[in-house]
């Protein structure tokens, strides 16, 4: 399972970065459609009012995922700005397959003054149970 976490955190963070770079380079708004329900992430372009898939990423069935959105297990959309940032930050948590313990967090921070998001990967110092306060900074360490 450790290898699965390594692969997924790399794949998801690279996918987010790819969308950000396209937006920055093309000066255009794109959409990340993260479908936890389908274990898929989509990179969408808005062409004449229709969403067209530029790329997609299958996320592993061997892990569980949640977000920092109000409905933690719901699918979500994030648009980029045409400068390459996201309209709003988000975090994706990587959990064991049963969805009982959190191991990693991929955070996309848009609050900084820069035009681009900061994409960071944090590792739980020890796996965090869902009923713990997993937002406490002391439970996490940033990976380089």
Language model regions located:
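Phosphate-interacting basic helix/loop segments used at nucleotide- and nucleic-acid interfaces
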Residues: 13-21
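N-terminal helix-rich module
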Residues: 3, 7, 21, 25, ...
């Amino acid at each position: 399972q450790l290898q699965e976490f390594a692969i997924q955190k790399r794949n998801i963070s690279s996918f987010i970065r790819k969308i950000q770079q396209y937006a920055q380079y093309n000066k255009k708004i794109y959409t990340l459609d993260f479908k936890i329900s389908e274990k898929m992430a989509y990179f969408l372009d808005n062409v004449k009012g229709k969403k067209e898939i530029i790329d997609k990423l299958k996320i592993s069935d061997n892990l569980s995922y949640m977000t920092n959105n109000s409905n933690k297990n719901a699918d979500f959309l994030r648009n980029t700005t045409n400068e390459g940032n996201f309209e709003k930050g988000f975090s994706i948590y990587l959990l064991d397959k049963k969805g009982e313990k959190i191991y990693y967090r991929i955070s996309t921070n848009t609050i900084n003054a820069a035009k681009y998001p900061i994409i960071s990967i944090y590792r739980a110092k020890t796996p965090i149970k869902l009923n713990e306060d997993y937002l406490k900074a002391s439970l996490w360490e940033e990976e380089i």
